[in-house]
Amino acid sequence: MANSSSGLAVSDECKVKFRDLKARRSFRFIVFRIDDKDMEIKVDRLGEPNQGYGDFTDSLPADECRYAIYDLDFTTVENCQKSKIFFFSWSPDTARTRSKMLYASSKDRFRRELDGIQCEIQATDPSEMSLDIVKSRTN
């Protein structure tokens, strides 16, 4: 289904891979990109379950926008093991203005397609999505 504000569709693969991450924990992270030619949101990269947060942040391009999902494992102050699914909107300052506008106008609709997201982070610089910042959002 196309996004009414941006005209973008969401590929079925996006939904399938997200369900695999959520239900089976098949992936640690998923990076999504907007394909300008097809006007569709597609899977760009998949992170294996053994990959860490550094692998995830390294997979985001320095000068292009992306959406991403990260499945964060953490320990609560009560010493309980938990996980939360984070949605990232990555829009670096060096990205093209048109790209930033397209990602911004499609974000809410795309996020609604992915049922089960627990936290959201918007970042324009790597410092805005440091692991400490992400962990602070688990409370």
From Swiss-Prot:
GO BP annotations of the record are: actin filament depolymerization
Q: What are the record keywords, sorted?
A: Actin-binding
- Alphabetical list of PROSITE patterns matching this protein: ADF_H
Quick check: keyword Protein biosynthesis in the entry?
no
Domain of life, per UniProt, equals: Eukaryota
Q: Name one GO molecular function term.
A: actin filament binding
Looking up InterPro entries in the UniProt record yields: ADF-H (IPR002108), ADF-H/Gelsolin-like_dom_sf (IPR029006), ADF/Cofilin (IPR017904)
Regarding tissue, the record states: Expressed in pollen.
GO CC list: actin cytoskeleton; cytoplasm
Give every ADF-H domain span.
7-139
Q: Into which family does the record put it?
A: Belongs to the actin-binding proteins ADF family.
What's the stated role of this polypeptide? Actin-depolymerizing protein. Severs actin filaments (F-actin) and binds to actin monomers.
Q: What is this protein called?
A: Actin-depolymerizing factor 2
Q: Which organism is this entry from?
A: Zea mays (Maize)
- Show the taxonomic lineage: Eukaryota, Viridiplantae, Streptophyta, Embryophyta, Tracheophyta
